[in-house]
Curated annotation (Swiss-Prot):
PROSITE patterns: ACONITASE_1, ACONITASE_2. Disulfide bonds: none annotated. InterPro entries: AcnA_IRP_Swivel (IPR044137), Acnase/IPM_dHydase_lsu_aba_1/3 (IPR015931), Acoase/IPM_deHydtase_lsu_aba (IPR001030), Aconitase/3IPM_dehydase_swvl (IPR015928), Aconitase/IRP2 (IPR006249), Aconitase_4Fe-4S_BS (IPR018136), Aconitase_4Fe-4S_dom (IPR036008), AconitaseA/IPMdHydase_ssu_swvl (IPR000573). Its main location: cytoplasm. Transmembrane segments: none annotated. It comes from Sus scrofa (Pig). Interacts with RBCK1 only in iron-rich conditions. Interacts (when associated with the 4Fe-4S) with FBXL5. Interacts with CIAO1 and CIAO2A. Binds 1 [4Fe-4S] cluster per subunit. [4Fe-4S]-binding affects RNA-binding activity, thereby inhibiting activity of the protein. Belongs to the aconitase/IPM isomerase family. This is Iron-responsive element-binding protein 2. One of its GO terms (molecular function) is aconitate hydratase activity. Its cofactor is [4Fe-4S] cluster. PANTHER family: ACONITASE/IRON-RESPONSIVE ELEMENT FAMILY MEMBER. The gene is IREB2. [4Fe-4S] cluster binds at C513, C579, C582.
Length: 964
């Protein structure tokens, strides 16, 4: 399906830019005059996209005028939005690209040309969610293979170059090489040599490997275990136009998006328009710090955009956040983020845009802004937007942006009034609500111990943690008896004795794009590590430390500035690029620590410079998890506890016994900025771009087919041609009635997408496990549903397989239901399979907020493949309802005030309904049951586009027919 041509209804607004480039653009301010001038900048971007894509069908003139009239229409109307591009990461990219591959098969079957099937929208796919930390300075457990590849092909492991001073722990124990206090403070040459040759152990052969090869070894294993998926991605990049794959080892999706993929202003056939992006990762919002409108959406919406269709959103309220003042020298971007997070959560910004303005905005660098924008999902906003200003232009110039294009960009943005002049506040937009935050009021802080919004000033950390021990179990409390709060447990580790207590730090990770995009906080961590090592401080060896950058850029400036060896000396060595500890892929703790935690029922702590700290996320046995800036992560690792007052208690002592306090080693802002200016330079950004464009040796040498149709491997348990198109006809058939449908499940309120399609591990007793076992896999090789999204057989069997699913037919939480013709209680999949063999259609009964939670495409695809024709609920989460329509399931809604109970429905009846020939949005339908009861429901379609998609049997069928 072709993308809409530019501005059918508004071609009269096309003008030529008044500069040497002579590019074309839509002069949208002409449309609205003073009404345009008071629109928030983010709404102006929505309006430009609407004007440019107005075709009278997918984007109507009424939609354009609704956006222009934002002040009165906000929160009341749905509007379509055509983003400029799409960003996928590998977990969600697999099902999207598998669907495209299957669509080629379907188009060929219908007699069309499969070579015509391409994404209409530029699509970038980054492979960043497959990294696991198999190698660091410790011996860890042999890891299962989550990607379908052969680990034996991951590359021969390097031999030991330097023997360890002490024997490592054996078996399942995880440990790190000793940090001899006598080594601290040595001359730089000897110091660097010692770090370079620190041995680690191969987790598969218990063979030591030299530390500098840590990253390479993790990447080797990553390519080995994910070979099957990577070959499919490479095929996709070869045969599909508009698809670019960023190979493993390059960086996280949103990090690469910021550093490499962002345009700020798009240029397409000499037409200029604002860059915008949607993607399948909630933290894609980072780019809003660069003045690029972007947010996360679900898999089906992403596929729709790739096929030239818009995403739909409620015209949002826009909260104006005025920043005033300047921050304290000891306050990092993370402190600013956590301060803003708490403030915005308190006032409530869920489902809203946040837009920053005020004198304080110019005090923030681009990396500060992107850090704040990246955290917006944690405080509930759709996005947090920083309009382009002089700071943005200076950043782009600094990073090597073409000067001629930069000048053209500035001219264009000023012409359409998308450039914010920080010297002139006379034309500030009007907002739904304005809040003020004085940057001077923000103090250094951390966030935790269980939620990112629970901010704690560092000065209050000790008293707050002690209060958490006292409080009842809840959002903050652990309810530890007073007489047990001072308990300690001794452990023997690497020949030394240590004591663990409540508050002991056992995981410390400098990780996540939240900080890796910000050189100042990363360099501050490195400088603090340098001063700590020079002062003779160390990190206790049982603490699991790691440094996982968002991209190679971070490695470059940490290395070139000379601070990387000091981080490594404290245990913070680079373990690889991608999501690791942040998403729970941390190496296991040692048995000594685990036993001590269990013995003393200790509340031990993880300290992470990421953006999520929900309980148990890092490790089940680590109950308290705190988000902190990178230098504070290093500081707490050195202290070994969060139960410390940095103002009055020392981190440790130097070799002479002198107390060393945090203020003794904390780098000044001037020091950090000096290092940043000297080492975060243009060459670094050029090197990153070259790395992406050239790929890497393993990716370049990876064999992949280049056939028009993908050669499906029938033995594969990861990638399979889905059955969505099995019954596809050249033309859509008339809407068929649903006759004598049985209820597959009778559910209550707040059924989440995780209840419907779990993403976690595959239970050994599940239908998916039986399928995998029959194909020769062991339970260790099952992996998770999330990793097998490219196999419809696994995902269909995993639908409604959540052990916490409460089906009223069963009366207790279990992934079971009743097959009424036989009376058997079966797994949901087994019952659905029987119904399909008997030719019986299915529906689902539900209460309020059906499909709430994270957007998940398989929460709609799975029920469809089970044979579900309709869902009848009291209310829906809108995104999930859109997904149901997009896959061909009718979303039916009880009349206001009615539900299954009030209508006397047991769910054991059969249900029949007929659709009118002219189905219209919100039409009332009559359902008749086998008991003779007749009641009315609402067909919950909101517009003509949704009805057209439903009549075609869903989005995929609609587009396949277009290509045919």
């Amino acid at each position: 399906m072709d993308a809409p041509s530019a501005g059918y209804a508004f071609e009269y607004l096309i003008e030529t830019l008044n500069d040497s480039s002579h590019k074309k653009f839509f002069n949208v301010p002409r449309l609205g005059g003073t009404k345009y001038d008071v629109l928030p900048y983010s709404i102006r971007v929505l309006l430009e996209a609407a004007v440019r894509n107005c075709d009278g069908f997918l984007m109507k003139k009424e939609d354009v005028m609704n956006i222009l009239d934002w002040k009165t229409k906000q929160s009341n109307v749905e509007v379509p939005f055509f983003p400029g591009r799409v960003l996928l990461q590998d977990f969600t990219g697999i099902p999207a690209m598998v669907d495209f591959a299957a669509m080629r098969e379907a188009v060929k079957t219908l007699g069309g040309d499969p070579k015509k099937v391409h994404p209409a929208c530029p699509t970038d796919l980054t492979v960043d969610h497959s990294l696991q930390i198999d190698f660091n300075k410790c011996a860890i457990q042999n890891a299962p293979n989550p990607g379908g590849g052969d680990l034996q092909k991951a590359g021969k492991l390097s031999p030991l170059r330097v023997q360890p001073k002490k024997l490592p722990c054996r078996g399942q124990t995880a440990c790190r090489g000793s940090c001899d206090s006598g080594d601290l403070g040595r001359n730089s040459g000897k110091f660097s040599s010692q770090i370079e040759n620190t041995p680690i152990l191969c987790p598969f052969h218990l063979q030591p490997v030299p530390e500098p090869e840590t990253v390479l070894k993790n990447q080797e294993v990553e390519f080995g275990r994910n070979r099957e998926r990577l070959q499919f991605f490479k095929w996709s990049s070869r045969v599909f136009k508009n698809v670019a794959v960023i190979p493993p080892g390059t960086g996280m999706a949103h990090q690469v998006n910021l550093e490499y993929l962002s345009r700020v202003v798009f240029e397409e056939k000499d037409l200029l328009f604002p860059d915008s992006v949607v993607g399948t990762d909630s933290h894609i919002t980072m780019v809003n710090g660069l003045g690029i409108l972007g947010w996360g959406v679900g898999g089906i919406e992403t596929e729709a955009v790739m096929l030239g269709l818009p995403v739909s959103l409620t015209l949002p309220e826009v909260v104006g956040c005025e920043l005033t003042g300047s921050s304290n020298p000891f306050v990092t971007s993370i402190d600013v983020v956590l301060g803003i997070t708490k403030h915005l959560r308190q006032i409530g910004v869920a489902g809203k845009f946040v837009e920053f303005f005020g004198s304080g905005v110019s005090q923030l660098s681009i990396v500060d802004r992107t850090t704040i924008a990246n955290m917006c999902p944690e405080y509930g906003a759709i996005l947090s937007f920083f309009p382009v200003d002089n700071v943005t232009l200076k950043h782009l110039e600094y990073t090597g942006f073409n000067k001629a294009k930069l000048k053209s960009m500035e001219t264009y943005l000023k012409a359409v009034k998308l450039f914010r002049n920080d010297q002139d506040n006379s034309g500030e937009p009007e907002y739904s609500q304005v809040i003020q935050i004085n940057l001077n009021s923000i103090v250094p802080s951390v966030s935790g111990p269980k939620r990112p919004q629970d901010r704690v000033a560092v000065t209050d950390m000790k008293s707050d943690f002690q209060a958490c021990l006292n409080e009842k179990v809840g959002f903050k409390g652990f309810q530890i008896a007073a007489e047990k709060q001072n308990d300690t447990v001794s452990i023997h580790y690497e020949g030394s004795e240590y004591k663990l207590s409540h508050g002991s730090v056992v995981i410390a990770a400098v990780i996540s794009c939240t900080n890796n995009c910000n050189p100042s906080v990363m360099l501050a961590a490195g400088l603090l590590a340098k001063k700590a090592v020079e002062a003779g401080l160390r990190v206790k060896p049982y603490i699991r430390t790691s440094l996982s950058p968002g991209s190679g850029m971070v490695t470059h400036y940490l290395s070139s500035s000379g601070v990387l060896p000091y981080l490594s000396k404290l245990g913070f060595e680079i373990v690889g690029y991608g999501c690791s500890t942040c998403v729970g892929n941390t190496a296991p703790l040692s048995e000594a620590v685990l036993n001590a935690v269990k013995q003393g029922d200790l509340v031990t702590c993880g300290v992470l410079s990421g953006n999520k700290n929900f309980e148990g996320r890092l490790c089940d046995c680590v109950r308290a998890n705190y988000l902190a800036s990178p230098p504070l992560v290093v500081a707490y690792a050195i202290a070994g506890t969060v139960n410390i007052d940095f103002r009055t208690e020392p981190l440790g002592t130097d070799p002479t016994g002198k107390n060393i306090y945090l203020h003794d080693i904390w780098p000044s802002r001037e020091e950090v900025h000096q290092i940043e200016e000297e080492h975060v330079v243009l060459s670094m950004f050029k090197a990153l771009k070259e790395k992406i464009e050239m790929g890497n040796k393993r990716w370049n040498s990876l064999e992949a087919p280049d056939s028009v149709l993908f050669p499906w491997d029938l033995k594969s348990t990861y990638i399979r041609c889905p059955s969505f198109f099995d019954k596809l006809t050249k033309e859509p058939v008339a809407l068929q009635p649903i006759e004598n449908a049985h209820v597959l499940l009778y559910l209550g309120d707040s059924v989440t997408t995780d209840h419907i399609s779990p993403a976690g591990s595959i239970a050994r007793s599940s239908a998916a496990a039986k399928y995998l076992t029959n194909r020769g896999l062991t339970p260790r090789e099952f992996n998770s549903y999330g990793a097998r999204r490219g196999n419809d057989a696994v995902m269909t069997r995993g639908t409604f397989a959540n052990i916490k699913l409460f089906n009223k037919f069963i009366g207790k939480p279990a992934p079971k239901t009743i097959h009424f013709p036989s009376g058997q209680t079966l797994d949901v999949f087994e019952a659905a399979e029987l119904y399909q063999k008997e030719g019986i259609p299915l529906i689902i009964l539900a209460g309020k907020k059906y499909g709430s939670g994270n957007s998940r495409d398989w929460a709609a695809k799975g029920p469809y493949l089970l044979g579900v024709k309709a869902v009848l609920a009291e209310s829906y989460e809108k995104i999930h309802k859109d997904h149901l329509i997009g896959i061909g399931i009718a979303p039916l809604q009880f009349l206001p005030g009615e539900n299954a109970d009030s209508l006397g429905l047991s769910g054991r009846e059969t249900f029949s309904l007929t659709f009118p020939e002219e189905l219209s949005p919100g039409v009332t339908l009559n359902i008749k049951t086998s008991t003779g009861k007749i009641f009315s429901v609402i067909a919950s379609f909101e517009n003509d586009v949704e009805i057209i998609l439903y009549k075609h049997g869903g989005l995929l069928n609609f587009v396949a027919r277009k290509f045919s």
